[in-house]
Amino acid sequence: METLVSSIFWTLTPWNNMLLLKHGRIEILDQNTMDRWYELPKQEFLNGEQPIQIFTTERYWILFRIGPERRGKARMPTDVYYLIHPTR
C-alpha cells in the first residue's frame, strides 16, 4: 500500500476560488475578480514534475502528491496543467 507523502490543506470558500497549478508554482485565484491572492512554489511539496491529485470539499482544498508507482499504474502524464473549478 502506497502512503501519501505530502498534503496541503487550505480553508477556502471553494465556489469563489479557483486553484491553478502551473510548472513552478501554484496559484489560488478569486473567480469573481481573478485576483491572485496566494502563490506557493511547487518545489515546496513536489519533487520534479510529479503531478498531484486534488480533492475538494465544501471547506477544504486537499492536495496529495501521487508517487511514481501509482502514476505508472494509472498511465498518468507527467507534463500536465491542472485547472480546478469546484462546484457548490
Curated annotation (Swiss-Prot):
InterPro entries: Uncharacterised_Ycf15. Keywords: Chloroplast, Plastid. One of its GO terms (cellular component) is chloroplast. Pfam families: Ycf15. It is found in: Plastid, Chloroplast. Belongs to the ycf15 family. This is Putative uncharacterized protein ycf15. The gene is ycf15-A.
